[in-house]
């Protein structure tokens, strides 16, 4: 069945008009046709779309004005006998099920894909009164939070004054004597921890419209795979699955049965075949079940949830004024959120799916404008999204597809309270996709609370494991030897390829960057204290190769997707082995090889034992000095697997503005 838009506006429904749903009895799994009968003219016209029906279906159906009656279809323009019959059920406008009304929307997934098999979510039409979920979806504007005077201040400082009990309401918060400071204490304005005590209005989930979320149509070639074929395919690609009724993996893009607009985007991107996480993750996500995905960075996780999300959007009713997004993707950092949005914009353009990125450190105005205009996909960091929800700029009542990307990192950064508040605003029957690179106990515990009967797919091992295509070189040196060794490495390695250098502190990151530029190296630095405009500039310069050396703290360790990073240098060893895995994972992406150098000092000795295990598992040569350190440090135990808290707010360093003196040739 094909649909086309109507140039003229749809007729206004009246209470005395009759609505009808026609079901092709010869093909009971095809979509139902919604029509509208004008009582005056007797003509049938759709409210939102002009249907081009099957030649064997009637263009005009005889409608009894009372109950539903089967009627035989007559061909519109010939006397040949019909091969199809249609059962017609009629209801008055006031009794029409709003779930069935969505089939008049030309953007409906099944309207656009008549080749789909499988019954709709609701097997038959019913009057609204007979369906407990049939209350029409009419989202109201978010109720403004009205705390008592001086109850909350995002950061201490100036702002709207409150009463004597606190620092006022608003971003600044001034007013009477209040909590103030970062975690309370003297001063003016509320403390930042006041965010945790603020509760968003509790939504009412008693009346929910059912929605469609199972879009998977198994390809005949996939159906034909035997259990032995499936096991062999998974074993060759190191895929482990858990769960009930796990779908078979798809080996080629065509086997996923994506709509044409997704296939066009895939073809234009030049991908050859799905990555392991995509081959198994796509069928899981398209089936509409909750899922857990555990895979290394650079394994193609973003498209694993993004393409099914685009299909999900296409199957839902259109956004109305005041609606929030349909797909919500939470990410831990600004950089990762921006990169996801770039992919969403690229692939969503083929289906005219709108998306926006909501993150801190950037002006709120453009983000608020996008939300008020209406977008189907929102990619956000938890803190800024809560700001938008508090301000009533958006709501999450339409969210039916939730993605938590790099959940382990979000927990490490202390976002668990914000995540819980956000999830509490989303309908409980949503589809949730939970992505992580590791599977510590805290991540598993949160997944148990948010997911229902999930699939689980693991690429490789859930334990700490480095990418085998990366050569890891550990150099045991002292602190004062680091910079001379870095200069020597750059002299040996620099040929115009991209080199990423990681530091533990923002201060050292800027300090070494200044020294590198003074020594003639084209280096730029990026970390959490940089303004967003400067961070965007640094990333653009690094990606383009104009400044092929980038110094960074762990703000760029996750989600940074830059092609052809030749080498990663850990100037400082991170505070967790998880961060070590993710740092070196910036090179060797998408099957390419890479090299990672790490400066390891005596102060890092507590990580030596577990680091040796990681190296041996990846088939790397272990430095004898590191092995000796691991033996002597055995009494100290393994490394700490929990990372530090979030950094503070400092001043811009100006390290990127230092002129490069006597640029070195390479």
From Swiss-Prot:
Region described as Disordered: spans on this chain: 53-102, 632-666
Motif interval(s): DEAD box: 405-408
GO cellular component, one term: ribonucleoprotein complex
GO BP of this protein: nuclear-transcribed mRNA catabolic process, nonsense-mediated decay; rRNA processing
GO molecular function, one term: RNA helicase activity
EC number: 3.6.4.13
Places the protein is found: Nucleus
Binding-site residues for ATP, renumbered to this chain: 295-302
InterPro entries linked to this entry: DEAD/DEAH_box_helicase_dom, Helicase_ATP-bd, Helicase_C-like, P-loop_NTPase, RNA-helicase_DEAD-box_CS, RNA_helicase_DEAD_Q_motif
Catalyzed reaction equations: ATP + H2O = ADP + phosphate + H(+)
This protein's record includes keyword ATP-binding: yes
Protein family (similarity comment): Belongs to the DEAD box helicase family. DDX5/DBP2 subfamily.
Comment text on domains: The Q motif is unique to and characteristic of the DEAD box family of RNA helicases and controls ATP binding and hydrolysis.
Protein name listed in UniProt: DEAD-box ATP-dependent RNA helicase 30
The species this protein was found in: Oryza sativa subsp. japonica
